[in-house]
Amino acid sequence: VQTLAYLSKEKNAFPALVIAPLVTLTNWQREIEKFLKKKSRNGKIMENKHPSSVMIRNGKQSDIDESDFYIINYELLHKRLPDLLKLNIKTVVCDEVQHLRSKTTQKYAAVKKLAAKDGVKFRVGLSGTPIYNRGSEIWPIVDILKPGLLGSYKEFCEYFCYVNEKGKAIVLENKRDSLRNQLTKHVMLRRKKSDVLKELKDKVRYPEVIASDEKFYRAELDKIWKKLEEEQKYAQTAFDKSASYHRAIESERQAAGLAKLPHVINFVNDIMDIEESVVVFCHHRAIHDLLHQSLSKYNPASIIGGQSDKRRDAEILSLIHI
């Protein structure tokens, strides 16, 4: 929303290209319609009209209709690059910009070309984690948003980094403050939750130990162990052995989840009895299905892999309005 507000105040910011993870595309389109209004030629707000938006979901090359916003996921960029280069884009927005931390990927090369177009006036990157473990991953991102700020990659590494035994460039500890100052001075607006949510209460964590059916778990673990020994005995390659271990690990995780399930259901019921909201995360579809079935009287929203975009969006909306 902050990005949309910024673009609405800038002159000649449209058309804008929004590049984002696949699961957030519909949300971008929804927020555009919710928060932005169309302006008339004389600059007046038109209450009943919104900026137009096109969501690009097909990898097949074809001309793209004119629009105020073009929304596409990172994975389709290189396939639709020729079509996107034809557009008169004025702004490039990269949501979860850490996707561009590797300068050798196809999506990085595509964004680099799009952001370097003569008509592009604004480049915006959004991320909660722009700097990863080594620190040097920030260079490709900054070189798209503000080319030349950190010099060439070689110059950046020579000044800010050392190279470890694996050949990876890592930002020196005594250079971190200097790099942070350079970024916040020229290109990075760092906002903490405490800065933007003044009225939000501090998060409080109460760890609760959930009981489990230990007898069931040990019986399942015994079956998994015997099956693993059998598979290892007849494994012909290192790949077969590795795959067998992975299957055993997944089976153990599911057994642990099933052993806790009745107690988790009781725990959720107790919370619901005092009319509090609950979010439950689970790893396996089988456990998800059992949870959903057992707690169906609360009509819970359910977000899980394999859902259609339409179904997932409907579930997200129902979750928001709970």
Residue positions per predicted region:
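Conserved helicase ATPase core of P-loop NTP-dependent helicases/translocases
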Residues: Y298-I320
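Conserved motor-coupling elements within RecA-like helicase/translocase cores
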Residues: K60-Y70, D313-L319
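Conserved Walker A/P-loop ATP-binding site and its immediately adjacent core
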Residues: F14-E31
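Conserved helicase motor "Helicase C" RecA-like lobe of SF1/SF2 P-loop NTPases
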Residues: C282-G305
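Inter-lobe coupling linker of SF2 helicases/translocases
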Residues: I71-L76, P82-I89, Q106-K121, L126, ...
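Walker A/P-loop
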Residues: V1-L4
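A short helix-turn-beta junction within AAA+ P-loop NTPase domains corresponding to the substrate/partner-engaging
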Residues: W139-G151
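Walker B catalytic acidic pair
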Residues: D95-E96
